[in-house]
Design a protein with these regions (language model features):
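Substrate-binding/active-site clefts of carbohydrate-active enzymes
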Residues: 101, 105, 115-299, 319-329, ...
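Active-site rim elements
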Residues: 132-136, 278, 305-308, 431-441, ...
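Carbohydrate-interacting/catalytic domains
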Residues: 1-19, 25-108, 117, 138, ...
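Hydrophobic faces of well-ordered beta-strands that scaffold small-molecule active sites
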Residues: 106-108, 162-164, 223-225, 304, ...
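Active-site-proximal helices and loops of the catalytic beta/alpha 8
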Residues: 231, 291-293, 297-302, 308-401, ...
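Aromatic-lined glycan-binding groove of carbohydrate-active enzymes
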Residues: 383-425
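Short, solvent-exposed loop/turn segments at secondary-structure junctions
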Residues: 113-117, 168-170, 229-230, 302, ...
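A solvent-exposed, charged loop/short amphipathic helix patch at secondary-structure junctions
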Residues: 122-140, 414-435
Length: 590
């Protein structure tokens, strides 16, 4: 698992104003930083293979600051440690966390039009014969979200950050055409902006949006909004005034520059009616970053989810983040992007002066194959996870999803109701997609257990908490259901609530260092460690009961562990044996 090369470091104890670090092998180099400034030698000691670090007195001036530790041995670099401080003490109580603590977020992704209809007075479906109901407006709005916050829906689930789809003005007429089912498409989703600073009246008024944010914050919930900077709809008055702001729809060799996402990454159009903006032009960057900042100035948002991040020039991200950081009130903002590509491409946008994180689709795709398909191999997921940790850091702010509005529902893939080898969009347009085999609920729970316990920011896509089925767009965007669940759906919802509660209340699962413990074709196990507290996670993709034997790292014994999901386990010294049911998982904690 370690290939004999990994140097792992982890925190083993804390005493308010100091903490200890243990190493799996002797390092020959140490780097210790507080707020990205190297700590003086007087604040740490190295003795008998153990590092003791003192909290600097200056930390008392900041409610939240961080110490980072990294080591190396014979050219092999360790995992990085992130130690949060609460003023001049090591953070050691959940009650010291705030909603501005980015590592402590659990996101909930919702599509406004498909979430909850709280005000039928603003319902304005196109009601056209050439637009099927599945791709027309269905009435979800700001009032619906407000109602669900007030009802306790999000707090009961354990969510502390809501990600809403775009709220800017979109066209009132349908666009595109599907030849198979004979339909055009409304802009119910919000991703075809006409004007990036005009509110979409389908969702509510400016006052109602202010109310939504006030109610969310009163309930200790962040709200981040989806912002589309890559393109404008061809009917945009901005493009009519500045046609030169768009990239060419024709490539140099005469082909249509449409959906050439990798070949012409920075210039390709998403559709013939969605011109891509030329961000290499300074005036375009200024205008679109000003438009993004407008939403922060007018409304009290807590960050952005950025659409199509990899298709936008790096200079745009640097300019936007520079403008945001000029205002101290926005230091807490969380920016997460959407990029499909290699870890190196994704990482190029995740750095100082750009984005906090991006959604890690590579780990998600691997998890879908492993937990959802018979031919999956857990070792591939283990490799992809370690690659991501090495690429983005062991305390990254990447997004780890249960699904999203551009993917077929995992539960239907795992249940065999839809195949990844077919056109998953077409599947949902020509037949009714169900859950399929009922074991798919267990497989979805295992995937969600994995995503909610690894480092990063977990994200639940609306409906995945109870297991709504569906193919790809638009079938994966069915109207949200809040009651009338069947027994399997209720049981699944209870599991997800418990998993989210563990994530929200366990410092090892929020800030813990991570070490792999075991991996074979069917089982993966790892440990999260924070100041001597541990969480051991084991997940199985097998259709049979499996027992796994684990050896805990230095300094840990298993005699005070407790299970959370009723799996049988035994401990003897530093050894732990866990029996996992088919498609089962367990989280052991001390």
């Amino acid at each position: 698992l370690f290939n004999g090369k990994r140097l792992s470091i982890f925190t083993t104890a804390e005493n308010e104003k100091s903490f200890e670090v243990t190493f799996t092998k002797q390092p020959d180099q140490l780097l210790i930083f507080w707020q990205n400034m190297e700590l003086p030698l007087s604040l740490y000691t190295w003795e008998k293979g153990r590092l003791t670090v003192l909290v600097p007195a200056e930390a008392a001036l900041l409610e939240r600051s961080f110490i980072r530790v990294i080591a190396a041995a014979q050219g092999v670099i360790s995992n990085d440690l992130l130690i949060p401080l609460h003023f001049d003490k090591v953070l050691n109580h959940i009650k010291e966390l705030k909603r501005s603590d980015k590592e402590a977020q659990v996101l909930y992704s919702l599509m406004i039009d498909r979430f909850s209809n709280g005000d039928k007075n603003n319902d304005r479906p196109l009601n056209r014969l050439d637009v099927l109901p599945a791709v027309d407006f269905q009435g979800g709005d700001f009032q619906g979200i407000i109602d669900k916050i007030k009802s306790g829906f999000f707090n009961d689930l354990g969510i502390n950050t809501i990600w809403m789809t775009p709220i800017a003005q979109n066209p009132e007429t349908p666009w595109g055409y599907d030849e198979v089912v004979k339909t055009r498409f409304s802009a119910y989703h919000g991703y075809w902006p006409i004007h990036p600073t005009v509110l979409n009246e389908h969702f509510g008024t400016e006052d109602k949006l202010h109310e939504l944010l006030d109610v969310a914050h009163t309930n200790d919930i962040n709200v981040i909004v989806d912002y589309v900077a890559n393109h404008l709809h061809k009917e945009s008055p901005i493009l009519k005034e500045h046609p030169d702001w768009a990239t060419s729809m024709i490539t140099d060799d005469g082909r249509p520059n449409v959906r050439l996402f990798d070949e012409y990454r920075l210039t390709t159009w998403f559709d013939t009616f969605l011109p891509t903006l030329d961000m290499e032009k300074r005036e375009v960057r200024e205008a679109m970053t000003d438009s993004a900042v407008y939403w922060l100035q007018k409304y009290d948002f807590d960050g952005f989810r950025h659409d199509a991040a990899k298709h936008i020039h790096e200079s745009y991200w640097r300019l936007l983040t520079k403008k945001i950081r000029k205002n101290p009130k926005w230091n807490h903002l969380y920016q997460i992007g959407e990029t499909y590509g290699s870890p190196s491409l994704i990482r190029s946008y995740v750095k100082t002066g750009q984005l906090d994180g991006q959604f890690d689709f590579n780990v998600y795709h691997s998890a879908v194959n492993v937990f959802g398909l018979a031919e999956g191999d857990m070792r591939e997921l283990n490799d992809d996870l370690l690659c991501s940790l090495d690429s983005y850091g062991y305390h990254n702010l990447m997004g780890y999803i249960s699904g999203n509005h551009d993917k077929p529902r995992f539960i239907s893939v795992a249940g065999g109701a839809v195949s990844l080898k077919e056109d998953t969009k077409l599947a949902g347009r020509v037949r009714t997609i169900t859950v399929g085999d009922s074991t798919s609920y267990d497989k979805l729970a295992a995937l969600e257990a994995f995503m909610l316990t690894i480092p990063g920011v977990p994200c639940i896509y609306q409906g995945d908490e109870y297991g709504v089925p569906g193919a790809n767009d638009p079938d994966n965007r069915r109207m949200m259901q809040f009651d009338g669940y069947c027994n399997r759906e209720r049981a699944h919802l209870d599991k997800v609530k418990k998993l989210i509660n563990l994530r929200r209340t366990s410092l090892p699962l929020i800030y813990g260092d991570v070490m792999p413990l075991y991996c074979d074709k069917d089982i993966i196990a790892f440990i999260r460690i924070y100041m001597g507290k541990i969480a051991i996670v084991a997940c199985s993709r097998s259709n049979e009961t499996k027992r796994v034997e684990l050896s805990l790292p230095l300094a840990f014994k298993g005699n005070d562990l407790k299970n959370n999901f009723n799996c049988n386990f035994r401990t003897l010294g530093d050894s732990v044996s866990i029996t996992l049911p088919a498609y089962g998982f367990e989280v052991l904690m001390n």
